[in-house]
């Protein structure tokens, strides 16, 4: 449809990605949602009218096919939300696993670079475009056991700033949203499916929700075209740093 604003979201099957799809649809975007877990995307498509496509950001062929499908259907992309990410393990470097570091860096760094490179022609085809990268407070902090993950999110910060320099002079805004503690599937994945250990992360805390971060994304992308929200840090009030959290302050009500 002519004039339709197209928002492309990676990692859209759950958490911040799914919440962003819902909120961006309500804000008037047509959402193209990509993820590996296509069964979950089906429900999202029915809920918000999104176009859903399989996507594995670590697979070059998958990324190329995803972008080609968006190009064939829409001809451009107004917004790219690089949300797909992971973090496996919380081990000190001395005990770290190669496979944990590999999947984290392949997804959070190489995957983000690959998707962005592949979508730049479609973003440049829009009158005004926007790239939103999901970073983390781990992109400017470190903590024991977090070497692989914090390295990946420091890289996201560097990539975001580099893109802003490289795209200067073009009508493409570049934003990083850096959340603190958000209650999603992240901790379950980090602890390899140990739900009890994941629950302990949020014990006694009112963490951020996926909708909180989606709300920030929608706010950033709906500013006037000449306004670029460079870098937004969002934490729950109980969290002063990655490793400094006050417990039992009460709920968010």
Regions found by a protein language model. Give the residues of each.
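Conserved glycine-rich cofactor-binding loop
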Residues: 13-14
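The beta1-alpha1 cofactor-binding region of Rossmann-like NAD(H)/NADP(H)-dependent oxidoreductases
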Residues: 55-65, 98
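C-terminal helical subdomain
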Residues: 176-180, 184, 196-243, 247
